[in-house]
């Protein structure tokens, strides 16, 4: 017989997840090369619609540090909710079928992840990077609104639907770069880029699936606390998958 999931067992799960995220962050920082990707801007060199100046590199993003940031953010969030100062608020939120801590962390960490994926596929323009970050964060915040204003089983889905609409936008943009739509014939993404995009796209959608199952009250998912543990597990797996796919293909010192 399976043990029931309790607030205290979730506390231990958060501590373990925090340790695993932190250990991976330290490993990435210790083992990574100084590989970086550019952030660029293209400015007008004449009237609108005429000519543009050559793209300029505004700065370079250290990829190893970016990976460490989203791992570190997750570690920090897990340790915060497990701490004596915040665990009471966290467990009360879980009992009320909401976890606002989750949405704050995801809004930042998953947006850093989508920006990194975009850069790996070839997106470098500063306006595109900012837009992708903002749209992805909006998707997460709609998930927050779903929990704030709706309850599982009440049939309210508007924030969830808006979140799905916002969430698909970055992936539509990435398709153009991954498959070189409209590009010259010689342009193509490396094989590992396809793997990263497919893997993380699948994980991102699995988070939406968990919320859908919770709010439809499907089987075991009618127990909100089970969904919370699933979110923790998915977050760890998704971030680990992206971190080590990036490391294996771009960050191993030569």
Question: Which residue ranges define each predicted feature?
Answer:
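Polytopic alpha-helical membrane-helix bundles and their juxtamembrane interface segments
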Residues: 2-99, 110-254
